[in-house]
């Protein structure tokens, strides 16, 4: 890790370690830069905010939590940072690693235990369970955030997620749209922010690998077979055939002037 003393036997080993640590540092700075740009473009953080990162245990949410912890040390607007997980009750899901990770970076952690899995897959038997699961999961977290006095939740949707959402919107809804960077939910008094909107998935992957962050295996029975996964694979194929398509779609999303998107605040 960066900043640790490492004994080496040869000059070649020393050079290799230096290059590895330099790459690690550059990737960390790149991700932090993209997150900060999004935060400032859409005024996501205000002085005195209490922000919880929604942590699923996956690479994106853990990367965002770690990056937000680093940002918390030097960002000019002071904010309190928390982490929250909704345990929907899938068999085999274990968030012990998430709790330990939060303890290691000194972030208060809250786990909300529910029976959402039973409701979605046994009681409801909906052929499209993802939207119901997401709605119930968010509702459970928002309720707990209100009890804790936390006013914002940060979701780890990255650049690829925004692009895939726009593609799904075209395919399944007949419109061009993506979720907004900032959304205030008056019924629960919580503001949703998405600070990783400019960060490509590959960059997040590299950050997680270099930080040595251990992710939690997703035991959802429909993981990997959803409409979003279909859109992801389709987008990858389109981008291979037409390099640069992802960037052009993201440009269109950011400049789409969607009704519920806030204005960009750039100097």
State the predicted function of each range.
Residues 160-240:
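Catalytic subdomain that performs nucleotidyl-dependent activation
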Residues 9-12:
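Intrinsic-disorder-associated, low-complexity terminal segments enriched in Asp/Asn/His/Tyr and depleted
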Residues 244-267:
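A short, charged, Gly/Pro-tolerant segment at domain boundaries
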Residues 22-166, 172-175, 202-210:
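ATP-dependent adenylation/nucleotidyltransferase module used to activate substrates
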């Amino acid at each position: 890790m960066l900043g640790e003393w490492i004994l080496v036997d040869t000059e070649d080993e020393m050079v290799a370690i230096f290059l590895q640590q330099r790459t690690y540092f550059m990737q960390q700075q790149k991700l932090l830069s993209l997150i900060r740009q999004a935060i400032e473009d859409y005024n996501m953080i205000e002085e005195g905010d209490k922000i919880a990162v929604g942590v699923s245990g996956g690479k994106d949410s853990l990367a965002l939590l770690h990056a937000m912890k680093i940002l918390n040390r030097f960002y000019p607007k002071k904010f309190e940072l928390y982490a929250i997980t909704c345990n929907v009750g899938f068999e085999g899901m274990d968030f012990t690693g998430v709790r330990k990770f939060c303890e290691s970076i000194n972030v208060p952690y809250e786990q909300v235990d529910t029976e959402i899995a039973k409701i979605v897959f046994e009681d409801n038997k909906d052929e499209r369970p993802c939207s119901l699961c997401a709605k119930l999961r968010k509702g459970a977290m928002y309720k707990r955030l209100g009890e804790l006095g936390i006013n914002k939740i940060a979701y780890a949707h990255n650049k690829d997620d925004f692009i895939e959402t726009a593609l799904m919107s075209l395919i399944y809804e007949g419109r061009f749209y993506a979720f907004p960077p900032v959304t205030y939910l008056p019924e629960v008094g919580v503001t949703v922010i998405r600070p990783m909107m400019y960060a490509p998935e590959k960059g997040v992957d590299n950050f997680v690998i270099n930080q040595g962050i251990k992710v939690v295996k997703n035991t959802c029975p429909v993981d990997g077979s959803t409409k979003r996964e279909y859109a992801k694979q389709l987008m990858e194929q389109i981008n291979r055939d037409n390099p640069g398509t992802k960037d052009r779609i993201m440009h269109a999303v950011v400049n789409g002037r969607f009704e519920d998107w806030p204005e960009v605040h750039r100097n």
